[in-house]
């Protein structure tokens, strides 16, 4: 069988997600490691008739069984658990800071912001620039690691990165 796609240009697409974004932002501001802290971002009681968990750190989920949208009354009482109120405008500022870092790797038309914690980067048209900037041939994995490190250094936020030839493959 003839591979009709072999002459097609390989694309470099990444779907990037900030790990437990709201909880991570709050953990960093408290001087805590976002992957190790026990923290939840809880809505105010008067808005939800008891408060809802808007975000939980990975450890709060793992150790205490906290889940997003859990009611305040169902959150385990644990002295190690930090409960903070949401700061939506601040999260928007942090999201802008992260997306500005992405703009160091792609042009605006190749940055697709899907939500406050998820963006798609099509690095295909920037690939030669990136290789000249870093003075070597790069793999998708290496570029993903560079982006993760730049965001972590600037914000303290950890990222997960899906890599593929198209958005669907990168999202998997």
What kind of feature is each model-predicted range?
Residues 122-123, 130, 167-172:
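Short, well-ordered, mixed-charge alpha-helical segments that flank or form enzyme active sites
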Residues 136-172:
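Long, highly charged, low-complexity intrinsically disordered interaction regions
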Residues 1-120, 125-128:
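Residues that scaffold, gate, or flank divalent-cation-dependent active/transport sites
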Residues 85, 133-137:
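Active-site oxyanion-binding pockets that recognize sulfate/phosphate
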């Amino acid at each position: 069988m003839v591979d009709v796609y072999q002459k097609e240009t390989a694309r470099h697409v990444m779907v990037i997600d900030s790990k437990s974004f709201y909880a991570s932002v709050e953990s960093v501001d408290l001087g805590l490691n976002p992957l190790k802290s026990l923290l939840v971002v809880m809505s105010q009681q008067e808005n939800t008739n008891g408060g809802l968990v808007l975000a939980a750190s990975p450890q709060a989920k793992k150790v205490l069984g906290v889940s997003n949208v859990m009611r305040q009354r169902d959150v385990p009482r644990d002295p190690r658990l930090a409960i903070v109120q949401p700061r939506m405008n601040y999260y928007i500022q942090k999201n802008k800071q992260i997306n500005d870092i992405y703009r160091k790797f792609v042009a605006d038309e190749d940055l697709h912001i899907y939500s406050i914690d998820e963006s798609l980067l099509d690095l295909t048209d920037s690939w030669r620039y990136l290789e000249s900037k870093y003075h070597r041939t790069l793999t998708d994995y290496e570029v993903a690691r560079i982006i993760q490190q730049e965001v972590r250094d600037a914000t303290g936020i950890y990222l997960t990165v899906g890599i593929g030839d198209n958005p669907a493959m990168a999202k998997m």
